[in-house]
Amino acid sequence: MRTNLLILSLLVLFTTNMHSQSSAWFSSSSEAKAYAQKNNVPILLVFAGSDWCKPCMMLKAEILHSKEFEQYYPSQFALLYLDFPMQSKNKLSPELTKQNELLAEKYNKSGFFPNMVLIDVQGKILGTLTYKHQTPEVFINECKSLIEKTKIKE
């Protein structure tokens, strides 16, 4: 009985966690844009190399998948995760690869990874964020500050 309760609890926790990760986390630019328009929020483009870029892996593990960030971001922006994997086992679909390359040409000309760019639904750059091995709380405060600055400009 105790084992069944533990398994059920873990299943509920896992399902809830997966839901929170997927609520505003996208790999498709059209889906991210639709979410942003519907919720009147900007889009955070996250350029990452999931299988070769150590800082990208750390950003994802320490910030993007942190409980604090997962609770914060869905009401603040759509997160568009633009992956550039190197290993063939992680290869993206041709459509996703093309989408990511086109967005990188426009918003990540320097080729810096990880790179985070906040844009509005029309594609106008509102600002950038940098991962500096900070805590989720510090990163969230940087997000809040950037979003506040964009509201002042409007």
Which residues does each PLM region occupy?
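Typically the conserved alpha-helix immediately C-terminal to a functionally engaged Cys/Sec
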Residues: 56-72
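Thiol-based oxidoreductase modules, predominantly thioredoxin-like and allied folds used
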Residues: 23-26, 69-98
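Bacterial Sec-dependent N-terminal signal peptides
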Residues: 1-23
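Hydrophobic beta-strand anchors of alpha/beta hydrolase catalytic cores
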Residues: 44-45, 79, 116
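Non-catalytic, surface beta->alpha helical segment in thiol-disulfide oxidoreductase systems
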Residues: 62-64, 102-106, 110-152
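Short active-site neighborhood of thiol/selenol oxidoreductases, capturing the structured segment around
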Residues: 39-53
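C-type cytochrome heme c attachment motif
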Residues: 51-55, 114-117
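A short beta-strand-turn-helix
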Residues: 26-43, 73
